[in-house]
């Protein structure tokens, strides 16, 4: 598929890398090519087995997305193309004036060297990753219903942190502002 490293790549020469960096990959293949697709499929399989047992069960289903790098099958990107239509948050002059220096997120548009085009692509990549993860959650909830377990099962959907998408000119999670700390 198509991929681009957005962070620290102002001249566009840096290759697509993995790890905890802003990369967008419009990946080839279907959901099952990706770990989250495989996780959802296995959870659905287990729910069908648990329904036959008619005993209490616990099933923890953890998805990677929408964590960076933003990787999802191409079909999840199409609603967010072209990236140029993505809206960026309004920048407030003096927004950091009341934040002590240690509280300034180290992931800013400036120090990540992300121009407006790359910022918009990051937003589109995040939205595509959320859409992909949402589809996987939908498969698990559908399997729960199909197994006849939905009325007797408690589903807890949570996350470990929020995520900045350019609000306050911050990106990722490392701040105490609402966008990062609330889930």
Predicted regions and their residues:
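Active-site-proximal cap/lid insertion segments
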Residues: 1-41, 45-56, 60-183
């Amino acid at each position: 598929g198509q991929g681009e490293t957005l962070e620290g790549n102002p001249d566009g020469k840096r290759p697509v890398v993995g790890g905890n960096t802003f990369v967008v990959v419009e990946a080839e293949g279907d959901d099952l090519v990706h770990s989250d697709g495989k996780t959802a499929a296995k959870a659905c399989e287990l729910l069908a087995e648990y329904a036959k047992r008619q005993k209490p069960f616990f099933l923890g289903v953890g998805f990677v997305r929408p964590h960076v790098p933003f990787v999802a099958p191409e079909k999840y990107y199409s609603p967010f193309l072209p990236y140029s239509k993505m809206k960026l948050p309004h920048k407030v002059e003096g927004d950091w004036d009341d934040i002590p220096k240690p509280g300034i997120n180290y992931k800013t548009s400036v120090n990540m060297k992300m121009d407006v085009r790359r910022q918009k692509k990051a937003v589109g990549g995040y939205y595509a990753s959320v859409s992909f993860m949402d589809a996987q959650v939908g498969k698990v909830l559908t399997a729960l219903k199909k197994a006849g377990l939905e009325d007797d099962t408690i589903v807890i959907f949570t996350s470990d942190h929020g995520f900045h998408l350019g609000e306050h000119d911050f990106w990722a999670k490392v701040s105490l502002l609402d966008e990062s700390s609330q889930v």
